[in-house]
Amino acid sequence: EFCQIIVQEVRNVTGFDRVMLYKFDNDGHGSVIAEEKLDSMEPYLGLHFPESDIPRPARKLFASNWIRLIPDSHCEPVTLVPAINPISKEPTELTNSILRSAAACHFEYLHNMGVGASLTISLIKDQKLWGLIACHHQTPMYVSYELRKACEFLGRMVFSEIASREETEDFAYRRQLAYVQSALVEYMSQEENFVDGLIKHKPNLLNLADAQGAAICFGNTCTTIGKTPVAEDLNFLVQWLKNNVQEEVFYTDSLAQVYPNAERFKHVASGLLAIPISKRNYVLWFRPEVIQTVNWGGDPHNAYELNQENGLRLCPRKSFQLWQETVSLTSLPWKQVEIKAALELRKAIVNIVLRQADELA
C-alpha cells in the first residue's frame, strides 16, 4: 500500500504516463511491486524481468546517480569533442553527467517497450542499488532541473521510509531468533548430551531457522527432528559436505543444483542450511520444495535476440508479454538473519562441547 502511494504521487508530480517501483532480488532480477499508469497501457505490475534487462554495469551507474533522464529515446547522440581528454589521455569520465547518452542497446530496449522518454530515480541502500522508481512516457518529455531535484529528494525520503520499515520487520525477527538461541544454549547447558538440548524442548532447533526438518550429525549418528531425508541420504549428504564445503556456513535454496542426488528427497530438502561443528560433525536444517509460478515480462531465456542486419549483433527482445515459468527444485530462501543465528549457535555448540570434554577429562 505504501509503495502504491509512492508511485501515485510521483506520477502526479511528474506527469509521466507510467510510474513503476522496481525492486531487485539477490540474483539481479527485478520485479514491479507497484505501478500507476494510463488505463490504456499494458500493466507490468507483478511481472519479473531478468538480470540482463538491467545488467551489472547499468546497475552500477544507477547506484552512482540518484536521477537518470532520457528526454527523447529517439534522439541522435552528439559526439563529444575531443573524445580523449587531452590532460588525462583517457576517455572523458561521464558517469555523473546528466548529459551522458544511453547505450544504443538501451535505446532499442525503450523503443521495444514503446517508451519515448524515461526518468529513473535510484533507491540506494548501504551504497547498493535496492530498486528504482521508473517513469515512462510514450512521447518525448523534458523534465526541468527543479523537478529533477524534487524527484531526487523524494526518492531519498521515500527510500528512507522503506528502509525503516524493513529494518523494523528485521528487528522483530532478530529479537525472536535471539530468544530461541538463548533458550537453546540454556537447554544444551542443562543436558548431559547437547543434542538433547537442541531437540527435546520448546523452542527447538527448527525454530532457529524456520525449518521443517533438522539433523545433528555427530560421530556416526544423525539425530533428526521434523521432516528430513532418510539416514542413508543424510550420510551421503554429510560426506558430500565434508568433501566440498570449507566455509563456516553453507546455505542454498536449490540443493539439487549443486548436489544432484538431492533431487530424490526434494520434497523434504530442496533447501539446506549447514554448519560444521568439526570436520566430521554437522548441524543441518532443511526446507521442502516450493513449486512457484513466476510471471515474467517476456521470456527470460530469450532476453536478447540475434539481429543479422548490418552484421551479427545482440539486440533486446521485442516482446514483453506475460510469460509464465514454473520453478521447481527450490525452497523458500534463507534469510541473512537466520544464517547469522546459525553461526552464533555454532559458536555456542563448540564452546559447550569443549567444556563438556574438559569436564570428562
Where are these regions (language model features)?
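Allosteric cytosolic regulatory segments
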Residues: 152-159, 343-347
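GAF sensory/regulatory domain recognition
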Residues: 22-84, 217-243, 247-257
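Signal-transducing coupling segments at domain and membrane junctions
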Residues: 76-115, 254-272, 291-306
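Signal-transducing coiled-coil/dimerization helices and immediately adjacent hinge/linker segments
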Residues: 2-8, 163-229, 326-361
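A conserved hydrophobic secondary-structure block that centers on an alpha-helix together
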Residues: 1-28, 116, 126
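Short hydrophobic beta-strand micro-motif common in sensory/regulatory domains
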Residues: 116-124, 270-276
